[in-house]
């Protein structure tokens, strides 16, 4: 019997949703950073096994929005819960169930798919705290299963995969065996550049940046020539992004080029231009130009 279905991964910001997706896929498709609210779009990735096909939706973390971009991210995440076959609800070991987790649980009550509670980052906590957290969440919702894992250490993730197959319905193969994502290359390129910016900039700047791929061409030798605009909200942020003697921007570019060459499996030449677009996160038309379509 072949099983297939759509699986959405939800949770508060920075609980490891993208890390888990990348681990299960064996490919780096979702942007990963230690800063919260890193994922901005629903990334759809496809994992095909001998008798199953899983289509993952990696969502932004659900949080209280502060601007139109934040509204887009929360709408995107809550919409993804609807009409799926299985939900993975990720959280971390904690002393109490937070408001963000309770908000997600309220959204889960409006859908019929089974929900697996995944307690991530157990390698960073004590067994006592892990047990306490599982007990706390078991009182909040009737989960189909509850499982502690470490996505970073690949601990217990094989068992999680078995549980996911168990709860998938019988269904067709929606995508070819060799297809691993439905997003375009340009989107992944933009996400890689944004990830490197996140890792090389101070806490104040990263969430005020966006990446727009202006050009992506492959020459006769197979080399990619890529030009991107790195968009920020303030002139002062532009100086921080460029850095002294351009060193910060050079580091973003060099680390992005290395990752892009691994992803594209070809040589890459990348040029990054820093542009100021004041309050772009509250500019609906600009947000849509940058690919954030689900604004209400």
Swiss-Prot record:
GTP binds at residues 11-18, 58-62, 120-123. Keywords: Cell membrane, Cytoplasm, GTP-binding, Membrane, Nucleotide-binding, Ribosome biogenesis, RNA-binding, rRNA-binding. Residues 11-18 are annotated as: G1. GO terms for molecular function: GTP binding; GTPase activity; ribosomal small subunit binding; small ribosomal subunit rRNA binding. Residues 37-41 are annotated as: G2. It is found in: Cytoplasm; Cell membrane. It comes from the Bacteria. Residues 3-170 form the Era-type G domain. GO terms for biological process: ribosomal small subunit assembly. Residues 201-278 form the KH type-2 domain. Residues 58-61 are annotated as: G3. InterPro entries: G_ERA_dom, GTP-bd, GTPase_Era-like, KH_dom-like_a/b, KH_dom_type_2, KH_sf_prok-type, P-loop_NTPase, Small_GTP-bd. CDD domains: Era, KH-II_Era. Signal peptide: none annotated. HAMAP family: GTPase_Era. Monomer. This is GTPase Era.
